[in-house]
């Protein structure tokens, strides 16, 4: 039997992913206290690779990994050609448009200035709404943009909303809910179907 390679995202959903694999008896080879990036489980024929969240979908799409665990935010932003096969139900938050309290999102015959770390998601959302936008790509502290006049609104991940409130901002419109998902390479899903379904069944049993 061939090894199944699974790409695991570092960061926000990392801890919960490792916990689930360990509960299923599949994570004993994973050591979170080491700088190693590859872990081999010879008994269960699984190789885990530890990568940046934004790279999980790339490893899966290119066939380096058969499966990956990544946030829905990463999947949407990267617009890659993979199968999304299971909602893990943790790492829950949402995408939202936020701005100064009482502000209006839409500008008739004007460009809306949108600051975000997720330009593809923002472009798609406002295109569907028929609103012309100017994207201002930021890598952090997106909430600052409307306050200092850099943008009209922001598109960002919101968990509790406390950071928005602390900075005088509010959610103006929800975009979509997000959570951690299992994604599969298209060819792997065909040729390693049984192995992949076995993993999914274990997750389903754990969640039910």
Curated annotation (Swiss-Prot):
The identity of this protein, by name, is ATP phosphoribosyltransferase
E.C. designation(s): 2.4.2.17
The UniProt function text for this chain reads:
Catalyzes the condensation of ATP and 5-phosphoribose 1-diphosphate to form N'-(5'-phosphoribosyl)-ATP (PR-ATP). Has a crucial role in the pathway because the rate of histidine biosynthesis seems to be controlled primarily by regulation of HisG enzymatic activity.
The UniProt keywords, alphabetically, are: Amino-acid biosynthesis, ATP-binding, Cytoplasm, Glycosyltransferase, Histidine biosynthesis, Nucleotide-binding, Transferase
Q: Which GO terms describe its molecular function?
A: ATP binding; ATP phosphoribosyltransferase activity
* Annotated source species: Clostridioides difficile (strain 630)
Annotated transmembrane regions: none
> What gene codes for this chain?
hisG
The text of the family note is: Belongs to the ATP phosphoribosyltransferase family. Short subfamily.
């Amino acid at each position: 039997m061939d090894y199944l390679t699974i790409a695991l995202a570092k960061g926000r959903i990392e801890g919960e992913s490792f916990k689930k694999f360990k509960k299923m008896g599949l994570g004993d080879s994973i050591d979170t206290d080491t700088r190693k990036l590859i872990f081999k489980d010879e008994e269960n024929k699984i190789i885990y690779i530890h990568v940046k969240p934004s790279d999980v979908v790339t490893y899966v799409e290119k066939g380096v990994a058969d499966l990956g665990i990544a946030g829905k935010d990463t999947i949407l932003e990267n617009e890659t050609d993979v199968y999304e096969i299971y909602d893990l139900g943790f790492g829950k938050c949402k995408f939202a448009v936020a701005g100064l309290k009482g502000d209006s999102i839409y500008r008739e015959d004007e460009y809306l200035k949108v600051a975000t770390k997720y330009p593809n998601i923002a472009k798609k959302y406002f295109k569907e709404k028929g609103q012309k936008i100017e994207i201002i790509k930021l890598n952090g502290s997106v909430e600052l943009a409307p306050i200092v006049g850099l943008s009209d609104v922001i598109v960002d991940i919101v968990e509790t909303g406390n950071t928005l409130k602390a900075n005088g901002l509010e959610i103006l419109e929800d975009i979509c809910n997000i959570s951690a998902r299992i994604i599969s390479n298209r060819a792997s899903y065909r040729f390693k179907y049984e192995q992949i379904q076995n993993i999914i069944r274990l997750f389903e049993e754990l969640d039910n």
